[in-house]
Amino acid sequence: MGKVEFSGKRYVIDGEPVTIAGGTLQFFRVPADAWKDRLLKMREAGLNTVDTYVAWNWHEPEKGSFDFKGETHPQRNLVGFLELADELGFYVIIRPGPYICGEWRNGGIPDWLIDEHPEILAKGPNGPLPRDIYYPPITYLHPTYLEAVGEWYNAVFPVIRKYLYTNGGPIISVSIDDEPSYWETIFQPFLTDYNEIITKPGGLWEKWLEQNYTLEDLRRRYKGDFKDYSEIKVPTSFSEPLPKLIDWHHFKLWMINEYVRWIYERMAREFDVPISILDPYLLQVAWRHFFTYMREHNLKIHVWTEFWYSFYRSSDFKEDKLGHIYYKTGIYRYHVRKAGTPPLSIETQSSLAHTIDPTEAELLYSILPPLGIPNINYYLFVGGENPEGYESHNGITWDVYSPVGLDGSERPHFGVIKALSETMTSAEGLADAELRPKVAVGLYEPYEALNLWGYEGLEESTDLNEYLLGERGLFTLLAMSNTPFDAVDLEDVTLDELLSYDQLWVYSLDFMSREVQDKLVEFVARGGNLVILPMLPRYDENLEPYSSLKDFLGVEVEREKARRNPRLIQFLSVSAEGIDRMLVRNTVRGVRGGEPIAFLGEKPVGAFVRKGGGSAVVLGFRLQYYTSHHDLHRKFVWKLKELQGVREDFEVTNPDMIVLPMEGKGYAYLAVTNPRGHPIKGRISYRGLEVPVLLDGIELKRRGTLYLPFGVRKGDVEVAYATATLVMWEGDVLTFRNHLSGHSEIALKGVESVKVSGGKIVDGSDGEVLRIVIEHPGEYFEVELL
């Protein structure tokens, strides 16, 4: 029988590394007589894996009546679908819930269960929530709910087990629930959950407090004279102390963790293939709580992620989304590397949009592998329709611009997926190459919750979507400044890990834990380079005065409250050496101490400090992404990198060419992207090698990405470099793709002559390195080694 393992970034199936190229086909929404055609279209697109949900309420429409063979409806034939996928050579990822989301009635939870046991429903602070909302939230840890889930698993698990890859079937992974996030209510602090099992004396809230704090801790933290845990009620408004609100948030994360553990242990008794989960909490920085819980309880779970940018509107993935995707992949890389599991984007948006521009689709899909995610599943790859009575968001339709439509037609981004999937599953060493940024951004997890809530009780704005994560945020500025970055959790990361970076950027609000402030002090003292903005923390995690970082740096940032209302914020001009009137938004604070490096008029608003073996840049304003003729914001980032001695391994002559270097053992691929879409041309220097030599530049006619090989070797032959993507190297034939230019330059070592198919040689030079320029009318051409 087969074996499913993993190594590095890839799955290992029967001893062979496999890069997952998958697509979601929800068999219960597609006519059964069309399954084979749709699967064949997936294979045509270069896919090797099919992903599907198994909806509880579809297969158990009435309590105790199960159908997995299509006896009551042909689209309930789970067994037939699995056998067909196996016959056609697909791997299968299966997601049996109990909750599947999927824009499906109740997210898969049966109506009969809710009707019979309304006590399982989550409650608001004032009682029950409306019953007719599209996903009625359920109290995860309610014993009645868990008992019902157990009965569902008793029915569906034997079917899944029979078709596991380890039993000769196609299933290589089984997932836990779907995006466990308290039915997406985790984003709102007081929407849920006030179910009696949580709020009653001795309930789950009280239990969690006892496990995490002494009463003395809570007296200090919540500013109350408590004699017993039962006196500490669940918060219901922002009038409560902020530390208590953050604890309420963390308590709900803990309930999710406990629920996931219950499901995992149930699955682990049945399945010997990887058990997976998608985006726990639907948060990012909070993932630390999940990964820590996994380590503490020895849960061997593969954590997947997802990327959505245009939900029910036309596609919108241009350069101003790069910051968010760098950030999300960064924190994801941080955790999955430590967990040792392969990164996989299980829901990479390929549908649920009015239209999807193929160049924007390419930008999203092609940026994921260089950012550490070679395994990509496209959701929803095949469109369908909802059986009557099971619809949720979409009425009858479940074809919202999928690559393969309900009628089997192919939409424009089908070809984009095909090209990338074929490259990622065949290019020599590409999937294993690693991004190794010299810069990191440090994230402090409590800020994430305040941003979600729109919390307004601090001096600094908590609108991190505007100033950090969003289209105009700092992270997009860094990405568009050719500054690849990792993302690290400041509460979890070790000092040695921080010191492995040449520069650390930190966005600070009024408070930061004592431990993190002290860690940043030690980081600078031991030689680290810190950039911190737009203030320095003055309080600790309990909102008690604490300012070890400020005291160590000897820098004072003046106190002035930031504005929240977008109609009331200021537009101000900050200048620096070589920077004349750079636009910044919202309050600009004066900075005293250190060497002034930025000014608002005559007032210093930025300072450079050398301390211990390191340095710090302290800014009293927010840096954001703006594009203009003067390009001041990118120039300011480059200035700060130069000030602190940060040098990338690559340089570009055109700053709109965005580069992500992926390095393997003795070789590299440079992902070179045109994110804006207008034609650009330029040269790249990588570790001292400037390319191209014969052409006058690398041309990128439109939005898109090339994966340029450097030093890729087989035997005595080496691709020294190429200005086209190396798709495949089979025997003596190298297949290249360049869809962004009609001319490509290839440099080979260990070769005297070549034959070109799909193009013609129009220039060349020989010697130790054979260089040729190929003019090719199509995207693909082949170079045969003679």
UniProtKB/Swiss-Prot annotation:
Q: Which domain of life is it from?
A: Archaea
Entries under SUPFAM superfamilies matching the protein = (Trans)glycosidases, Class I glutamine amidotransferase-like
The record's temperature-dependence note reads: Optimum temperature is 80 degrees Celsius (with reduced chitobiose as substrate).
Report the outcome of residue 306 to Q.
Answer: Retains 40% of wild-type activity
Q: How does activity depend on pH?
A: Optimum pH is 6.0 (with reduced chitobiose as substrate).
Q: Name one GO cellular component term.
A: beta-galactosidase complex
Reaction catalysed by this chain?
beta-D-glucosaminyl-(1->4)-N-acetyl-D-glucosamine + H2O = D-glucosamine + N-acetyl-D-glucosamine
Entry keyword set:
Cytoplasm, Glycosidase, Hydrolase
Which residues does the Swiss-Prot or TrEMBL record annotate as the active site? 179 (proton donor), 347 (nucleophile)
Q: What induces it?
A: Induced by GlcNAc(2). Also induced, to a lesser extent, by colloidal chitin.
Disulfide pairings = none
User: Coiled coil where?
Assistant: none
Give the pathway listed in the UniProt entry for this protein. Glycan degradation; chitin degradation
Q: What is the effect of changing residue 179 to Q?
A: Retains less than 3% of wild-type activity
Q: Name one Pfam family in it.
A: GLMA_2nd
UniProt lists the family membership as follows: Belongs to the glycosyl hydrolase 35 family.
PANTHER family, from UniProt? BETA-GALACTOSIDASE RELATED
Subunit structure and binding partners = Homodimer.
The protein, known as: Exo-beta-D-glucosaminidase
